[in-house]
Amino acid sequence: KPPMAKELLEFYTPEQLRAHWLSLGLDQRAVSFSPKAFDTSVSRKGKDGEPDLLVKDDPRVVDPALKESAFLTNIFNRMARSCLYGAANACGGHLPISEPHQEVIDAAQEVLLKYEQLAYGFDAHSALAAVDEYARAENKRWGEASKAAQGNDEAYDQALADAFYALKTITLLMHPAVPEGCERIADALNFPHEEFFSWENAFMGPKELAAKLGQSAEEHQLEELPPRFDFFKAHPSQKN
């Protein structure tokens, strides 16, 4: 029988489950929910009297329920950490002073409008897919720009400005799916939730939002994160 909610929460975080379910597109097609933690089918037959190896115990088997978690930890979390650690090192713990490139602003506006249209049609699966595609592209942009800017403070500030603009957009759009992690990012960026997650401010970058709140980029203090901080934490049962 299907696991109860209480049982699921013994192996997965609410954020992981919500992101997975929203991505399945259950309103469009029939998809099975197959969390590895509850899969008791045989992965490998035991030999010489040894017990069979079940899927739930086989480290070689990828957990379908954690597919979206790879995006949260490998793309989204990395982007947030890159921005905050980068600003701590290069901007004195404040926002970058550069204006984002127009192509960065255009890309953000495009995904915002696409997401809003899809959400209006209750197409959560496609809306999250649009954010995923956008976030991966912006993460790649940041990786290339930050690498090219090594040793050039002005170019690095510009790369950070682009990344911060994208980070705000990603965090706003992912908030309905993973609110806890997104609100933790807003806290680290030192913005009130009611302003940061307001759709009235959706087309504002962090620098513009700070200005609305009466601060310049140089005045807006960011949180100093400890090393290797995770905004999207794994369930204790998933840690090696």
Q: What are the residue ranges of the model-derived segments?
A:
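Catalytic adenosine-cofactor/nucleotide-binding cores of aminoacyl-tRNA synthetases and other
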Residues: 1-99, 202-204, 210-211
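Residue-level signal for cytosolic alpha-helical hairpin/rod architecture
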Residues: 2, 108-113
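Short, hydrophobic/aromatic alpha-helical segments in well-folded domains
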Residues: 4, 114, 169-173
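Secondary-structure capping and boundary motifs in well-ordered enzyme cores
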Residues: 8-13, 42, 60-75, 100-108, ...
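Short alpha-helical "patches" and their helix-cap loops
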Residues: 35-43, 59, 90-105, 150-153, ...
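Core structural elements
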Residues: 74-82, 129-141
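Secondary-structure edge/capping motif, primarily at the C-terminal ends of alpha-helices
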Residues: 87-90, 94, 115-122, 138-151
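Basic, alpha-helical terminal appendages of large translation-related enzymes
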Residues: 132-240
